[in-house]
Amino acid sequence: MDEREPLVSQSTKEGSSDSSKSESIDDDGVVLAEEKLDHARWLLYISHMFNQFSEQAWQFCVALFLAAFTNNQSLILVTSYGLVTYSTVCFFGSSIGRYIDKSNRLAVARLFIGLENLAVLTATVMCYILLSRDKDTTMISGPLYDTKSVLLLVSIHLLGAVAMILDSGFLVAVERDWIVVMSVVASNIHKSKDSSTKEEEEDNTQKEWLSDTNVKMRQIDLSCKILAPAISGILLASLDDGTSENHGYNLRGATLMIGGVNATALIVEYICTAKIYHEIPELAMKSFGEIAEDKKKSEIKLDNNGREHKNGHTESTSKPKILVDLEVYFSQSICWAGFSLSLLYLNVALSFGNIMTVYLVWRGIGLEAIGLWRGVSSAMGLAGTFVYHILAQKLGLVDVGMISVTFEFLCLAICFGSLFVNDNDVFFIMLIAGVCFSRIGLWVFDISVTQLMQLHIPPPVRGLVGGVQSSMNAFFTVMIYVAGLFLSDPENFKIFASISFAGVTSAAIFYGIMVFARRRIFMPTKDDNNASSV
């Protein structure tokens, strides 16, 4: 079945006298298909909300669990946890992407959902055991690194890494594949309503559907990043039994709470994903038989440089898989937009993260002011999703991306300049204003690049390219964690800020070069339209 064909195209086999009846059947079929698509999209939002809320709650609480084990006297376990988890995504992201490309959609989603939540559930049990100490140990000033504790800590690190790579894979499958298929269905429904619909109108319908969906997904992401830690913090305070300030007695109840959240998420995500799959028959096209057919059709592919690819991957028997995967990624017409996005993951210093918070305290800024403006910064990120929606209706995606990354660069230039201002009040105003407004540019750029990749990455390598993108994002995040191991003094914040500013500057340069040197690749062509179908 070609997803570009109208979903309902019944012929009037019973003669002209039955034509009105056939039209009625067609209209009813279109309405039913439209209702199913709308229902599937709401199920997608619900599933994504539970996925992100449970993930953000776990990431927030696991840092507290690990810090509590050291009596909140060291960040070494928190840092090591971040290094292990992000390094895992960095090294195995592309492999997960390959698996997505060659597997049945529903089977992959169920596997990722089940294993991810089970990994977190098991890790919460490990945390509960780790934080369960005999009350006599409250007199001990340091953590108990006995054999049992070491094994538990290693298990928590490994299970957290498994959960993160599976969560990354699930997001790649949904955001880079499922949503694209559903957008094509929306385009077909529009065509079925009016058989005279032009191809350009079909593309606009698909792009508008993608834009609306991507905005809602990012709004859910940002809302969960704000609400999950806030709600978790409130519940943690209510669970404080006051039995001990050492070794995390008051956090044992929190481990059970996080376990319950993930168990609920497992059930909801599993049900919603299955319902979406059955509501949208086109998602079933990636059955094992059709995968083989796709491979036959794409046995030989030529990238922009004229190199031959087999099954969407560069022919090579001697190269390591990671190099082959990178070659496939950088052979895509939209690769430098994705690379520019990954460079923004270097910006942790100028983003109201932990590093910036510590530096502001060191400069004498009050915690209440920091907390207030951190909330404002998050709200500005949410505002960015609305700004994107407005810009996308008036400008092309490429132009939206160029404007947003340039805007973020200008905002962070103000932040970087503030570090050399001696007046504390002027410094604070410049830094906070730059950071808050830069969040608008960041999320507008994120959504525009995501949609460009959704539209331009061919079906046989969607998972692989998405996996490589996740790996590169994780790679630049790991670089910051490594730097943090050696630059722990707040006085070194300028170095982190320089790295962040350099990352955003490089992102703007790479994206600008791609736009102005290769703008022809964004012109609508028949090949581009075919690339958007499954």
Question: Language model features by range: what are they?
Answer:
Residues 12-41, 275-344, 362, 532-534:
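Juxtamembrane intracellular "pre-TM" segments in multi-pass secondary transporters
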Residues 43-60, 81-119, 151-239, 258-272, ...:
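Substrate-agnostic recognition of the 12-TM MFS/MFS-like secondary transporter fold
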